[in-house]
Amino acid sequence: MTHTALVVFGDGSEEIEFSASVDVLARGGFSVTTASVMPRESKICKLSRGLKIEADINIAHVNSSYDVIVVPGGMPGAQHCAESTELVNLLKAQKSRGGWYAAICASPAVVFKAKNIVSSEKMVCYDYKDFNDALTHGGNMGHGRVAVSGKCITSVGPSSAIDFALAIVECIAGKPKADHVAKELMMTDRSHPVMQ
């Protein structure tokens, strides 16, 4: 069985978090679709350090369900994701049907918390006061570099991006598959997800 992933992004999304998610999930046997959240049906986004990426589709044309929806961080990319009504609706439907949803860096606070995707799930995020306050005051602050709470997977930032993507593979395709991908990547000392 082929697992499926939707990796969304916008202008200002973080390059490492986006590319690590796409690459590691593909290595894990996932069929990965990338979607731009930018308006006017744009598929090309300029990421946080200037790299231009063309998405497979614009978020307005997503009409499939996926095993996981992945939201990279970076600013203002996370804010663009939060402003996408289509993405917010997809995430709410994903949670409602018991699907997996994952965010890293700013996105756990800016997207998942601010848009009420989560309720009691514990999350981690980029170490920035406003993001930490949003999770702490909402009772959603977790611990570790990669956190799994229910069907919600979150992580802290660029340095944990590969571990984040491996956690997604592990949660959906199993630990042996994640271990195989980690070995391919020559990761001898990876951060395993912390169950919250």
Which stretches of residues belong to each language-model region?
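Hydrophobic alpha-helical segments of small multi-pass membrane proteins
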Residues: 128-129
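Cytochrome P450 catalytic-domain "roof"
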Residues: 148
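Class I SAM-dependent methyltransferase SAM-binding "motif I" and its flanking Rossmann-like core
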Residues: 125
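Short, thiol/selenol-centered motifs that function as redox-active sites or metal-ligating centers
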Residues: 104-107
